[in-house]
Amino acid sequence: MKLIFCRWKSICEQGIANAFKRIGCDVVELNREIDDVDYEQDYLKELCELIQDNPGVSCVFSINFIPIIARACKIFNIRYLSWTVDCPSFQLYSETVKYPTNRIFLFDRMQYEKFRPFNPDCIFYLPLGCDLATWDSIQVSEEEHKMYDCDISFVGSLYSEKCRYNGVENDLPEYMRGYAEGLVEAQLNVYGYNFLEDVISDEWAKEFKECVKWHPLAEDYREDIKGIVADTYLGYKCTETARIRTINAISEKFNMDLWTLSDTSMLPNVNVRGGADSNNMMPQIIKCSKINLNMTNYPIKTGLPLRIFDLMGAGGFVISNYQAEIPEYFIPGEDIVLYDSIPDLLGKIEYYLEHEDERIQIARNGYNKVKDYHTYDLRLLTMFEIIINE
């Protein structure tokens, strides 16, 4: 199969490109950032010319659904395959989602159930995976062991810089701010079920919108006010608060490395290591950590984030917050360890630091499960099978 891969510097693009080659695809790449994902005329022109110059192309592919790519594919009546790796993904609110040329694959089942009604024949559920063959090829040197060996590591943002709520909380009336903070605190006590959008009323969401500096969506978008408030304001605030509290609690009892570019001034006990390149540093960090921590972003309501597959695919022992879909693919306690509160997490960290044999066996089981069922190669073959059998 010949396809055009529209790359825009998503962290998982290289792994997907590697998998396309391994399964025998002929890939033509359009590799540049998109200034306006909805209407950039230069990008539209460049992609249309690339489609015209490659008459044997069967489809166009991108990470995340991008409306300007959908527009080009509609012009040529060529299938546009997209695989969304983010929640929320605002572009799914675009009216271009309804194009019959789209084949949209979503990794979070609740996200899939929310958006599927807008194009029932063209939106599918597909979990994420990892570039296991590349992770396998990475050997950790003695020098890298000295640099990266640690008891516990977390790689990722604290979400302080991404949390819109922080920039608007002082614009809210006291009663609204109190209600929002109460929702966040209540959500933080519930693992495995995100109820924020369910409990917010339409009236409260509209009032919230009126009080803050709202970032309006493009004209041809559906404006889901409740969804945006729940995910990008309250959901991100939950993520930020949970990560800071969890890392603080861990670092008060254990030796922990944190790889992040976020502000860490509120985390005095953690070993702040700076940023970590996803392809050239993260695999070594995973392989050198006794415990790899996953804390899922709250707007990912049921699905498995990309990070879980990367951690397990690199052979890491993983402790993760509970997500509803995890038991569908991995056996808790055999392939991965799950926690349902900070005290539970601290107890499991202590246990598995003291029980190396169990820790190593669980990491091996998780790796084998990813190798057998959850590689990018297998996921892309599933994707092609779906569109071929339509």
In which residue ranges do the predicted regions lie?
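Short, conserved loop/helix-junction motifs that constitute active-site signature segments
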Residues: 73-75, 96-99, 145-147, 251
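Active-site proximal beta-strand in glycosyltransferases
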Residues: 73-88, 103-106, 128, 153
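Nucleotide-sugar donor-binding catalytic core of glycosyltransferases
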Residues: 4-12, 121-300, 323-326
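Catalytic binding pocket for nucleotide-activated donors in carbohydrate/polymer assembly enzymes
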Residues: 4-7, 11-14, 18-23, 28-37, ...
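N-terminal pre-catalytic "stem/leader" segment of glycosyltransferase-like enzymes
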Residues: 1-77, 228-232, 255-256, 376, ...
